[in-house]
């Protein structure tokens, strides 16, 4: 079986060596072929030299696809997804650190390689020096309970840097265009929930490095800073519109393959703004299209 890690880099000279060392130190099954596929998004620091140095030292493991300015982590990962030829595909951020058993424990969690599956784990939250921080998972966006398709349409509860997918899922997802996509990992999660299975490994298998340059982070959903940012009416209205656009775009890509039940869940959500205000609120409440905290639910009911 070919195990492939997709590593997207951009100006990551401060952390990428440590991450690459953790990937190369992964415990492996002797029967597996192990590879790391890297795409650099036009870094202007020492990142290109660092990753080329690792490729020269580990030519049978590390491949760098031709450099191209992607402009975002999402676009960079989409390039990697299109270039991937792995049987099991892991997604990796340049600034995290993987525990040695990350790959093996994730592989063991898959139930099937014939139907679409996505496996994700918990994570340790760490500072810039990888010192583990005390964190209550119930207060973070890493925490989830009772995931449903309705909940996943309004909020991604799964950290993209912890996920792996099988070939069946990636082949099903891949296309030339992804209308309305908010993030590549959210899209993968939606596909897994709609057409396959999401599997949770309850062990903390990576250290998620919390620092000022994180593009998306493990947010404290009950902090005053986070709450105040989600009371901004203009931002909330735009965010809600983006959620509806993503659901509609996803449905336009795969709706003809959905079960009638899942198709109705998508249609019920992305057509919300075609209803009057009271009907929108009732549809969200009765349908279970609800975010994870009271503040966020109130915001979405007002501005969706």
Give the residues covered by each predicted segment.
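C-terminal subregions of glycosyltransferases and related glycan-biosynthesis enzymes
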Residues: 181, 209-304
């Amino acid at each position: 079986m070919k195990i492939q890690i997709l590593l997207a880099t951009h100006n990551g000279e401060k952390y990428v060596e440590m991450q690459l060392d953790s990937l190369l130190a992964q415990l492996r099954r002797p029967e597996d072929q192990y590879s790391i596929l890297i795409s650099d998004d036009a870094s202007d620091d020492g990142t290109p030299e660092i990753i080329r140095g690792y490729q020269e030292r580990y030519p049978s493991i590390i491949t760098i696809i031709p450099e191209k300015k992607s402009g975002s982590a999402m676009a960079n990962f989409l390039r990697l997804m299109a270039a991937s030829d792995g049987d099991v595909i892991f997604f990796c951020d340049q600034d995290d650190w993987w525990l040695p058993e990350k790959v093996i424990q994730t592989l063991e969690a898959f139930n099937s390689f014939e139907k679409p599956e996505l496996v994700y784990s918990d994570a340790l939250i760490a500072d810039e020096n990888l010192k583990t921080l005390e964190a209550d998972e119930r207060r973070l966006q890493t925490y989830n309970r009772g995931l449903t398709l309705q909940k996943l349409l309004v909020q991604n509860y799964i950290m993209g840097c912890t996920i792996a997918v099988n070939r069946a899922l990636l082949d099903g997802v891949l296309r030339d265009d992804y209308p309305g996509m908010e993030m590549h990992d959210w899209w993968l999660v939606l596909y897994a929930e709609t057409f396959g299975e999401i599997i949770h490994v309850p062990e903390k298998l990576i250290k998620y490095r919390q620092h000022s340059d994180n593009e998306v982070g493990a947010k404290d959903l009950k902090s005053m800073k986070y709450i105040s940012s989600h009371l901004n009416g203009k931002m909330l209205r735009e965010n809600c519109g983006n959620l509806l656009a993503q659901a509609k775009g996803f449905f336009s890509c795969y709706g003809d393959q959905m079960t009638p039940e899942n198709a109705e869940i998508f249609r019920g959500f992305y057509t919300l703004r075609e209803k009057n205000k009271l009907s929108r609120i009732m549809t969200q409440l009765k349908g279970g299209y609800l975010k994870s905290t009271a503040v966020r639910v109130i915001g979405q009911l007002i501005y969706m």
